[in-house]
Structure formats: structure tokens, C-alpha cells
Curated annotation (Swiss-Prot):
Expression induction: Expression is positively regulated by the oxaleimides biosynthesis cluster-specific transcription factor poxB.
This protein's UniProt keywords: Oxidoreductase
Listed Low complexity bias regions: 1-12
Annotated metabolic or biological route of this protein: Secondary metabolite biosynthesis
Family affiliation: Belongs to the asaB hydroxylase/desaturase family.
EC number annotated for this UniProt entry: 1.-.-.-
Oxidoreductase among keywords: yes
Residue span of region Disordered: 1-25
Protein function: Hydroxylase/desaturase; part of the gene cluster that mediates the biosynthesis of oxaleimides, cytotoxic compounds containing an unusual disubstituted succinimide moiety. The first step of the pathway is provided by the HR-PKS poxF that serves in a new mode of collaborative biosynthesis with the PKS-NRPS poxE, by providing the olefin containing amino acid substrate via the synthesis of an ACP-bound dec-4-enoate.
Name of the protein: Hydroxylase/desaturase poxK
Single GO MF descriptor: oxidoreductase activity
PANTHER family to which the protein is assigned, alphabetical: BLL6449 PROTEIN (PTHR34598), PUTATIVE (AFU_ORTHOLOGUE AFUA_3G13140)-RELATED (PTHR34598:SF1)
């Protein structure tokens, strides 16, 4: 795919001649959507980039709001970590390229220019990580501008379950390397960063995995399309994908419960990123110090967002991370 000259959004393009206060900061209590309870044998499902059968809605999942206190990590960024919370804050990412070096509307440009820096940042942040494989990226924008980006995900979710993580390893690493890598520690980690920070609109909230119980996470099914929904144009394709291919995997939908602790990083900038851990195989080991190993997360609307604030424009890079420990 050849890079194009399509314009990309900037803060100035959305906030011309507007003097804005700093982004909202501090703890905030605000509604977050959680999936409704399903009674077996019914289960929640969602079709993504994959037309459902005639007469079938693309999803049967309905969100129900709960008032959640989201704690601000600004000034205490090191108070969370991957082993306990499945969340880590990265700062000082001056070596991660941005516009105009990266054309965000070109998959080829993102893969060649942005991916290597993300892989290096993750290896630096996660001790013992020897292999990082990016299997997709997704760009989100609150106004769907200038190309059809996805909007922020406004419902709490967990992108993959443990079995889905195993399937991802086998799918993307192949029949030889995949089983070998599954003998060590394997994880799915999202690298999330704004493309026009600081973020004012729809920041991301993440629940500490140590505070979310397994029985508070419902298991739903996502039906993903082939090229359009699973690997392209969201990221790196598998070898010779079939455009008609369909792929299904389990994902998690949490219930809100007392005792959960939710966090966000106010005014996150382009030299910062969040590592959001979706799965860590070490959490399954007896006497493991990893607590939960999976972070449910959601965008949320901050009622303190000032009028005329810039839209949120961000990228989420999904990575398989392998280590020997």
C-alpha cells in the first residue's frame, strides 16, 4: 500500500482561535457502560467488519451505566504496574515517531515507521521480553475525520480471553514457532497513545486487574471478518489472508462491582503511552505474583471537558509479547 497525501487531523485543525484551559485532571466520578448480564444458554456476541446473517443484529450486547470513580495517575504514574494492575505508564517516548514522519492513513507507513519503535519501547519496558510481534493496530477518532476511523470504545471490555490469546499465538506465530513460544511466558499487550495529545476528550479508563474478579467477567464471542476486520487494514496481515475468511474468538465483558479500582492518566501527551495488558499466561500459574493478568478498559466522557476541546485521535497497537520466565 502506497502512502498518500491525505491530510491528518491536528489539535489546531479542531481548535482554531480557541484558548483552552489545561485538560481536566484529578479523580472523577462518571458513568461507564458495562454489558448487561446474560442468562445461559444465551450469550453475547458481536460482528466486527463482518456482515451478520440476514435478520441478525450485529450485536445483542446492551450497555448499562454504572457510576465509577476513576483515579488520576498524573503525578503518581509509577504507582501501577503490569504484574499487579495489568497497566503501566510509559513516559519520555521521544524515539517513537509521529506525524509527519508517519502517515497514519497508510498501513505501510505505520508498519515500517511506527511498529519498530513500539516493539523497542515494549522490550525496554518489560523485563525479559525477547520477542514482540504486532498483529494489528487500530486508529480511533471521535469525529471520524478525515477517513473512516473507528470511534472510541465506550463500553468496558477485554479484547481477548486466555483461550483466544493462545489461538492468536498459533495464528500469528505459525505451527512451528507458536507451540514453542507457548512453553514460555506469553502475553497480549496494547500500546495506547494519542496522536494529537494532550487528550481532552474521551480518555481511557483501565481497571486494576488485582481488583476485578474472574466471575465478574462474562465471556462473549466476536465474529471477525477476514481482511477487513481481523488483520487489514488494522495492521499486519497473516500470510495470504482470504477476504472471505471469518474468525471468531472470545472476549470479556466485565460487570461493575464494589472494590474495583479504575485509573486514567489526565492530559496524556504524545510522548506518553499506556501499556494495557490483555492477557498474561503467568497469572495462571500456582503461587504467581501476577494478579489477574488482564485489564478491562473503556473510554469515558469527562463532564469537565471544556467546550471546543480537540477531538481524541489515538492509536492502539496489539502486541504478542514473549519471554522465557
Amino acid at each position: 500500500m502506497t502512502a498518500t497525501a491525505t491530510p491528518v487531523p491536528t489539535v489546531a485543525s479542531h481548535a482554531q482561535d480557541i484558548t483552552l484551559p489545561p485538560p481536566p485532571k484529578g479523580d472523577i466520578t462518571t458513568p461507564i457502560l458495562f454489558a448487561q448480564d446474560f442468562q445461559k444458554p444465551s450469550t453475547g456476541y458481536m460482528f466486527i467488519k463482518n456482515p451478520p446473517p440476514a435478520g441478525v443484529p450485529y450485536t445483542n450486547i446492551r450497555g448499562e451505566p454504572a457510576m465509577v470513580t476513576v483515579e488520576d495517575l498524573r503525578g503518581k504514574e509509577n504507582s501501577v504496574n503490569l504484574d499487579r494492575d495489568s497497566l503501566q505508564v510509559l513516559q519520555g517516548l521521544t524515539d517513537v515517531p509521529r506525524s509527519p514522519e508517519v502517515n497514519w492513513n497508510s498501513v505501510e507507513s505505520v508498519e515500517k515507521t511506527f511498529y519498530p519503535a513500539v516493539e523497542a519501547a515494549i522490550k525496554s519496558a518489560i523485563p525479559g521480553a525477547h520477542t514482540v510481534h504486532i498483529f494489528r493496530h487500530g486508529i480511533r477518532h471521535t469525529q471520524n475525520w478525515p477517513v473512516p476511523y473507528n470511534p472510541p470504545a465506550m463500553i468496558a471490555h477485554l479484547d481477548q480471553t486466555g483461550p483466544a490469546a493462545i489461538n492468536r499465538v498459533l495464528r500469528h506465530m505459525g505451527p512451528v514457532e507458536g507451540p514453542r513460544l507457548l512453553q514460555g511466558r506469553y502475553r497480549i499487550v496494547h500500546f495506547w497513545t494519542p496522536l494529537n495529545g494532550p487528550v481532552y476528550t474521551c480518555p481511557v479508563a483501565v481497571a486494576s486487574s488485582a481488583t476485578v474478579k474472574d466471575n465478574d467477567i462474562q465471556i462473549f464471542v466476536s465474529h471477525l471478518g477476514g481482511i477487513g476486520g481481523l488483520d487489514m487494514p488494522l495492521g499486519r496481515p497473516v500470510a495470504k489472508p482470504d477476504a472471505s475468511e471469518q474468525y471468531r474468538e472470545d472476549f470479556g465483558a466485565p460487570r461493575y462491582a464494589n472494590g474495583q479500582r479504575w485509573f486514567y492518566l489526565s492530559g496524556i501527551t504524545q510522548d506518553e503511552a499506556l501499556l494495557i495488558q490483555i492477557f498474561d499466561s503467568n497469572a495462571l500459574q500456582k503461587d504467581s505474583t501476577v494478579q489477574g493478568g488482564r485489564a478491562v478498559h473503556s473510554a469515558f466522557r469527562d463532564p469537565r471537558t471544556p467546550q471546543g476541546a480537540p477531538d481524541r485521535w489515538s492509536i492502539e497497537v496489539s502486541c504478542l509479547v514473549f519471554s522465557d520466565e
